[in-house]
């Protein structure tokens, strides 16, 4: 309670000092395990299964925990699973982040995308920020963030938000190991040449058959969400796999992509 009171006071001082041209400020819920902010890179030119496997870049909880994708080893093939890290950013940094959220105007934005760069940049991704409060979800996106200079202060705020969260993810103290409770698994048939350097073929790792997975439209990709013991077992197997691991089911080879699901994500829905 003392921590929350101190943070609310700090936010009030920031709001008084900096103001907000939108007339409202970002707030924190009482429940510390509530997700208040997420950033992501969405879309872009990539195989469909990689687009479907995209996950939040940063996930910030009301209690100050920041979960993000950690550094990946500079090797190929790299690990199959994304590297996840969890830190605690502290009260001062939380106040700084929420001030940037105000600068972007997220508390009064429903769903807005800046596409200024689309005239000169093709096939780039959207940098997206999601802010969650008692009124719902607030989304602001910038196409090709950082590639094209713009005078829009909201775009500058987005660059500041991503940069600030990147720094906090590296410099803040650890909040313990991040453990996923649910996992999204994507599978697609894929030819494998076992003579290709690094390629390995392993037995199908899931209790469900490939045919039991949900088809994603007509994209040739199937999906399922694992929870509890199934998720734990799959993560254990996937931890020993890499980007060139393929999976055999009755003579048919598959490529599998997997990622953790956060509490506010359903999985297998697009």
Q: Which sequence ranges carry the predicted segments?
A:
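Extracytoplasmic low-complexity, Pro/Thr/Ser/Ala/Gly-rich segments
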Residues: 22-88
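Charged, amphipathic alpha-helical segments
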Residues: 90-118
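Short, structured motif recognition centered on aromatic/hydrophobic residues
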Residues: 58, 97, 101, 129
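Sec-dependent signal peptide recognition
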Residues: 2-10
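Generic detection of long, well-ordered alpha-helical segments
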Residues: 87, 91-94, 151, 155
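Short, well-ordered, aromatic-rich surface patches in folded extracellular/luminal domains
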Residues: 20-46, 50, 107-270
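A short, structured loop/turn motif at beta-sheet edges
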Residues: 62-63, 90-94, 131-137
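C-terminal motif of bacterial Sec signal peptides marking the signal peptidase cleavage site
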Residues: 14-17
């Amino acid at each position: 309670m003392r921590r929350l009171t101190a943070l609310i006071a700090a936010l009030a001082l920031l709001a008084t000092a900096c103001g907000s041209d939108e007339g409202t400020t970002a707030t924190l819920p009482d429940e510390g395990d509530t997700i208040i902010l997420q950033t992501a890179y969405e879309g872009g030119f990539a195989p469909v299964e990689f687009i479907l496997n995209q996950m939040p870049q940063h996930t910030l909880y009301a209690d100050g925990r920041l979960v993000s994708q950690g550094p990946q080893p500079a090797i190929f093939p790299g690990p199959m699973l994304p590297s996840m890290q969890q830190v605690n950013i502290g009260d001062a940094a939380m106040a700084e982040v929420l001030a940037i959220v105000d600068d972007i105007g997220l508390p009064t934005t429903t769903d807005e995308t800046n596409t200024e760069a689309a005239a000169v940049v093709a096939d780039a991704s959207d940098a997206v920020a999601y802010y969650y409060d008692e009124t719902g979800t607030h989304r602001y996106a910038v196409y090709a963030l950082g590639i094209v200079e713009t005078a829009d202060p909201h775009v500058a705020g987005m660059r500041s938000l991503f940069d600030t969260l990147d720094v906090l993810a590296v410099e803040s103290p650890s909040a313990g190991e991040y453990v996923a409770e649910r996992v999204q698994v994507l599978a697609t048939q894929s030819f494998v040449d076992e003579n290709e350097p690094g390629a390995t073929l392993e037995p199908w790792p899931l209790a469900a058959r490939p045919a039991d997975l949900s088809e994603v439209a007509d994209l040739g990709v199937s999906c399922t969400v694992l929870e509890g013991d199934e998720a734990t077992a799959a993560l254990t197997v996937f931890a020993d796999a890499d980007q060139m691991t393929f999976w055999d089911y009755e003579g048919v080879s598959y490529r599998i992509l997997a990622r953790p699901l956060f509490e506010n994500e359903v999985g297998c829905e697009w």
